Amino acid sequence: IAVPVVVIFGLMAGWDLKPCRLWPVLARNMFLTGAMFVYFGCLGFFPIAAVAAGLFTAPVLVMFIDAIWSRRSIGPIRLVTAFVGFIGTILVLKPDVGGLGWANLIPVSAGLMYAIGNVATRKWCEGESAVALLWSYMFLMLVFGGFGVIYLYFNPGDPGSYLTRGWVWPSATVWGWIWLQAVFSLVGIGF
């Protein structure tokens, strides 16, 4: 829904939808798309608070990744601020991770990919228009989501499973919610 809306509105408004540098934009969008797929995939296996806490590691990780990428040190005030913010996130979400283990790093990998995508936006995509970044990101989400739907159509899994059930046509009410969410996502993210 979002891709045609952005493209049609962008063409009508005379926006330049073509990225200046395709490969850096594509690489950046791969990280962000991977983050969202891991995030939503984890919702079927982990408590929502644990998944959200994993994604909300991104701001702290952005600071560290940017420091490594740019080869500059992190000052004590930024370190303390990031630590306090991260602890605040944990206290608000109260993730019941049931004992830390390797599996708990899966939601954190969404935060890591999201952080890399954010740093890559600044490092690789300087000069790109926001609308070119937005529609190309949404398009990549559409492509990977489409592959998933096609795969599960021909190889349906357990109908009761969150991730492996085949395509189910949404009801009119659900379509209404999907459209509403798409419009507000576009307003919130890009317009």
Q: Across the structure, where does each feature detected by a protein language model lie?
A:
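Glycine-/small-residue-enriched transmembrane alpha-helix faces in small-molecule transporters
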Residues: 1, 98-123
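Transmembrane alpha-helices of multi-pass small-molecule transport proteins
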Residues: 1-34, 113-117, 136-153
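Hydrophobic alpha-helical transmembrane segments of multi-pass integral membrane proteins
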Residues: 1-8, 128-184
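Alpha-helical transmembrane segments of compact multi-pass small-molecule transporters, enriched
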Residues: 4-5, 54-68, 83, 140, ...
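C-terminal transmembrane-helix exit sites in multi-pass transporters
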Residues: 10, 41, 58-80
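Loop-to-transmembrane-helix transition segments
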Residues: 14-40, 102-110, 159-188
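Structural motif at transmembrane-helix junctions in multi-pass transporters
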Residues: 38-55, 130-131, 190-191
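Hydrophobic transmembrane alpha-helices of multi-pass small-molecule transport proteins
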Residues: 77-94
